[in-house]
UniProtKB/Swiss-Prot annotation:
Induction: Induced by toluene, probably via the TdiR/TdiS two-component regulatory system. GO terms for molecular function: benzylsuccinate synthase activity. This is Benzylsuccinate synthase alpha subunit. It comes from Thauera aromatica. The keyword Nucleus does not apply. The gene is bssA.
Amino acid sequence: MSDVQTLEYKGKVVQFAPENPREAEIPADELHEHLQNPSTERTRRLKARCRWKHAAAGEFCEKGVTAGIERMRLLTESHWATRGEPEPIRRAHGLKNILDKSTLVLQTDEFIVGYHAEDPNMFPLYPELSYMAVQDYLKSKYSPQPAKEAQEIVDYWKPFSLQARCEPYFDPVDLHRGYQVSTIEGPVFATGYNSVIPPYETVLEDGLQARIALAEEKIEHARAEMEKFPWHAPSGLEWIDKIDNWKAMVIACKAVIAWARRHARLCKIVAEHFETDPKRKAELLEIADICQRMPAEPARGLKDAMQSKWFTFLICHAIERYASGFAQKEDSLLWPYYKASVIDKTFQPMEHKDAVELIEMERLKVSEHGAGKSRAYREIFPGSNDLFILTLGGTNGDGSDACNDMTDAILEATKRIRTTEPSIVFRYSKKNRAKTLRWVFECIRDGLGYPSIKHNELGVQQMLEMAKYSRNGNGATPEEAHYWVNVLCMAPGLAGRRKAQKTRSEGGSAIFPAKLLEITLNNGYDWSYADMQMGPETGYAKDFATFDQLWEAFRKQYQYAIALAIRCKDVSRTMECRFLQMPFVSALDDGCMELGMDANALSEQPNGWHNPITSIVAGNSLVAIKKLIYDEKKYTMAQLMDALQANWEGYEEMRRDFKNAPKWGNDDDDADVLISRFYEEILGGEMMKNINYSGGPVKPTGQAVGLYMEVGSRTGPTPDGRFGGEAADDGGISPYSGTDKKGPTAVLRSVSKVQKNQKANLLNQRLSVPIMRSKHGFDIWHAYMDTWHDLNIDHVQFNVVSTEEMKAAQREPEKHQDLIVRVSGFSARFVDIPTYGQNTIIARNEQNFNAQDLEFLNVEL
């Protein structure tokens, strides 16, 4: 590594030599290629042969990846055969047909088994969701084969698709605007994108046989109620839909048990007739025993729990319906089974290192999991497979530290195996034990870009606040409010046996303030990308005599866009309730089971989040306009519009003035006061006037993922000095790349000024590699985190990777396959990201800590 960095602090010279002296021998531009350390040779082999499904610029990074046809074929077969039956039962039979007839996949070395397509290089498609998304695959090199059959399937499903069912409820003009993905993210019914928090707890604690018994008891009770004298139609007829839902739950659960037992038979056949290695043969027989029992029965040990959870994940996220995510409180969920196997050794006894290996194997299964996302989502998650994100840490229902040895096993496995997925959210509380915090730090220090950190206590408060709007008065209790996870990158939601989020149309999707500001300046017209009217006619900027007129024009554009975006989600939710029932997910939820309702329809805990992305470009632009045009009157709005139309060409001095105007992230009230007002009054205030399907206000949770690149490329030049087509700000409240010039604690102070209705925004920070890898690294990071917590900031995530190493990877990508970076809400292998995206990460300031920063953090070195 490079020469040792030093700093004078509190009267002494502090040296930041590597904590591990051997790192001094490693060239700085190849550090991360030396950090992988799988716990066993098996996981080393599994990683070497992993069939990654990462995509960038809409294309898959690895050769041989393609869409499979089995799921869509078998779903279509069932849909045709069940004409005339109630929709929930049709959906259950569709799942059953897939599980009964689909090809099973069993791979060498794996212990956790199960895949969701007919080949490990394949992924399924979902013609029942978006006809546009599937049609795009059919026109690509990833088309399922036979192509003629695939086209016939898509044609069959088009009138039945979620997209086709939703479109008639919108003005075609509004739809066309939404499909541009410039002012708002494409409607959920057009993208097919989804997310869910499966109630894993009921599967592991009860087993599916118990869920079947519950549903059958409910059916018997309902029939008895319907037969009572005197007949009362208003209440009696309500049982009909409930009975259909319970019947569908039974069909779905029985199908999943049978599918798991098909895996058991396959493992037994391979062991008894084909496997020659005695050790692997015994292992296959053990897997067969587990699959015979799981998920039919309650889990008893850690191997049981891991396999049962994996089967549940596949059904909920890939087979019954597509859903992004890997949402779960994994350490709390698995702790009883870790305790049984590792500590008490009462069932499936093992050592801690064996638990670490199991987690490494799960991480590789997730890395291999393919998702048939639309092209738009393959573009906006550059370098990603899908947004697989789990949650750790935080506090228990009684407020005590929730960290345990399972938490540490997950973090250790993560550090060792070095995969981009699943990403991890850590709920930071000052109650968390130091041992676990050290593991969190080491993962961050080693450049994984995660765990990202969420404020534990703020999350609990958010769950309790959302609970106030519960439609049936059964929102989160104070104890349940502690059991929250991130649904995807940023939005928190309850996990557990009941009240978890079941569909993306509850919370998610995005709105783009930078583009909205651009069209606000042009009477609602998008001149730089779509070349069409994108919003209401609110006037031309050159005619705005005051800044308040501009502010109010933006408010109207924002109101139009956010109302359209939320309406898209709620219309989609309504059609999901009618035609896209999820009988398996419903069977796992105690509320759905009790009430006989489908998971899409039941909403006990509102979770209405929506993502403003590119907010800082818009905010910085408003600051510059106010200062240079309305306050100082150095320029006129007409001059600014001419400069923007010219992409600043010929207006270089003027651009310098706008670029040098006060910027967010420097603890400068000349920027921070107006931008804080922008966040609280417009982005949050106007959004919260909208009430979603669940009865609660929609709240902002800015999380850029890769949309800051995609939308940046569709946004013309902006008054903050940005050129047209350049990437926007990379978080939800992160400073624009390279403009945070006053150090890491100035960023914290700026962000902390936004308090009202704005506590769910992504903050990206890039920290000094020498400082983080020194013996002082943990102490500085820990003090930073405690300060962040005290400032009541919701989120932060870190890149700890040098510019030198990233540029080396650009020159010789084949030598840097293990270099991982945080993009925004997810991590990716640097070499899988397009150059445009790579350069946005290089452009982020690498924050050093000076003496003033350390004093503000009150750190002792």
